[in-house]
Amino acid sequence: MRRSIARLCLGVVALVWMAFPISAHHSGAMFEPVKTITVKGVVKLFEYTNPHSWLWVTVTNDDKTTTDWGFEAEGPSTLFRAGIRKSDLPPGEKVTVTGRPMKDGRPAAAWVSLVKEDGTVLNPRPQ
C-alpha cells in the first residue's frame, strides 16, 4: 500500500513538474555592461521569437562592404507591452540602433534603443 501511494505521489510530482514550461535562457554576461554602440543601417530581418527576439540590420561600412549586425531583445510578449510589433520593422526600413556590444567584438549587441527614419523611437523594454 505504501509503495502504491509513493508511486502515485511521484507520478503526480512528475506530471506537475513537466507541466512547467522549460526554456533555455542565458545571462547578458556576453554584452558590455555599460559601453554602447550606435549603428545606422537597413532592417534585414526581425525575428519576433521566444525566448529572445533578434533584429538583424545590414550596415554599410566606410569601405562600402556590408556587415549584418544582430541586436538581441526581449521576447514578443515584452516587446508587445513596449508597443513594438513585428510589422513595425519590415525589411528595408532604415534605422539607427543603439546597443550594448558583445565583449568578444562580434557584430552583435543587446538592443537598447532604435530610431526609425521617421523619428519614431522604439525601446524594447516597457517604461
Feature map (PLM): residue ranges:
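Short aromatic-glycine-enriched beta-strand elements
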Residues: 49-60
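OB-fold/S1-family single-stranded nucleic acid-binding modules
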Residues: 102-125
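Short boundary/loop segments of OB/S1/cold-shock single-stranded nucleic-acid-binding domains
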Residues: 22-37
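Short, structured beta-strand/loop micro-motifs enriched in basic residues and often containing a Trp
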Residues: 73-81
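A short macromolecule-binding patch
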Residues: 62-74
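Conserved hydrophobic positions within beta-strands
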Residues: 39-43
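Bacterial N-terminal signal peptides
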Residues: 9-21
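Short nucleic-acid-contacting surface segments enriched for D/E, G, S/T with interspersed K/R
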Residues: 80-97
